[in-house]
Curated annotation (Swiss-Prot):
It is found in: Cytoplasm. It comes from Carboxydothermus hydrogenoformans (strain ATCC BAA-161 / DSM 6008 / Z-2901). ATP binds at residues 30-37. This is DNA replication and repair protein RecF. InterPro entries: DNA-binding_RecF, P-loop_NTPase, RecF/RecN/SMC_N, RecF_2. GO terms for molecular function: ATP binding; single-stranded DNA binding.
């Protein structure tokens, strides 16, 4: 799959933009602050249904009242149009010109993998950031996972509301706990199953790219189990603690994902370079997983890759990503090695040429 055409209206510093893209490796270059990352952001918005770096109201171009993003996606010879329109009155998504009830109905129509310079700091920060990264990836590849996640979040919201009540809600909590256990067990199973596959891919890739010295393990740390009856019993045991804290404290919404190299936790002992390398391997493994398991190659978006790695590492990474993606976007401040790209786009003040 690849982005055939992108159209923007009042998005960030783009007043109006219409650009066609080719498959393959695309260089987007220009000075800092001209709109390179904004272009990447717009494409990835249609992958995850929101910005990866700001709230919707901050994306509207100064002086405008709304923004629009539209894209034509080519996949196996078929064309699909996706879009989003946002104003202070609300937001809605479109597929082939038809309004959708929610973003979940179009999630997966454009699969994508993103890497930005800020991601290692964010990813290795709070556990919620790592859960979010894993959930966004799995939701793209499995409709069942997405539905279980949606149902789990709805039940969790109801349970948290009950835990804040002053009257006796024990019977109601038990009913919600059983539903949490049911959906939670499926979420945990899918996360563990996926990470087992990703671990093999990560180590195969590292053997060739040599980013990190030794065996790498992405380890899933769960507060429960992957069996709904066991989770239900755990939730019953922890009810008093949850009632005291007035929030749900156990389940996949509190689980974590840690990276180890030769048994050492990268979050604690890893250098910034090692964290960057581990996260890139994780991202690359996602592209491989999508291509092999789901049968659809994602669009890859690499923001400011040139400032992060030397030429040898860059070329190796680009080659691997291109092997498992039909389209790779790379942003840079300088037009380096132009002959190596299928398309080159220059950006200045929100204008492309």
């Amino acid at each position: 799959m690849f982005v055939d055409r992108l159209q923007l209206l009042n998005f960030r510093n783009y007043e109006e933009l219409l650009i066609d893209f080719s498959p393959g490796k695309i260089l987007i270059y220009g000075a800092n602050g001209q709109g390179k990352t904004n272009l990447i952001e717009a494409i990835y918005y249609l992958v995850i249904g929101k910005s990866f770096r700001g709230k919707d109201n901050s994306l509207i171009r100064f002086g405008a009242e709304s923004f629009q993003i539209g894209a034509k996606i080519s996949k196996n010879g078929q064309k699909t149009t996706l879009g989003v329109e946002y104003s202070v009155k609300g937001k809605f998504f479109l597929k082939n010109g038809q309004k959708q009830k929610s973003f979940s109905s179009i999630l997966g129509n454009l699969k994508g993998v993103l890497f930005t310079p800020d991601e290692p700091v964010i990813f290795f920060g709070f556990p919620a950031n790592r859960r979010k990264a894993l959930d966004l990836f799995l939701a793209q590849t499995s409709k069942t996972y997405l539905l279980n996640l949606i149902y789990y979040q709805k039940v969790l919201t109801n349970k948290n509301a009950l835990l804040k009540q002053v009257w006796n809600v024990d019977n109601l909590i038990e009913a919600w706990n059983y539903k949490l256990a049911e959906f939670g067990a499926e979420i945990i199973k899918e996360r563990e199953k996926c990470l087992k596959i990703l671990n093999d891919i990560i180590n195969e890739l590292n053997a060739q790219l040599r980013f990190l010295p030794g065996k790498i393990e992405a380890s899933y740390k769960t507060s429960g189990a992957d069996d709904k009856e066991k989770i239900f019993e755990l939730l019953k045991q922890k009810y008093t603690e949850e009632k005291d804290k007035k929030q749900a404290l156990f389940g996949p919404h509190r689980d974590d994902l840690n990276f180890y190299v030769n048994g050492r936790d990268l979050k604690i002992f890893g250098s910034q370079g090692q964290k960057k390398g581990a996260l890139l391997l994780f991202k690359l493994s996602q592209a491989v997983y999508m291509a092999k398991v789901s049968g659809e190659k994602p669009v890859v978006l690499l923001d400011d890759l040139y400032s992060e790695f030397d030429k040898e590492k860059r070329e190796a990474l680009e080659g691997f990503f291109l092997k498992y993606s039909d389209q790779v976007f790379i942003t840079a401040t300088e037009p380096i090695d132009l002959k190596n790209y299928h398309q080159v786009v220059f950006i200045e003040n929100g204008k492309v040429s």
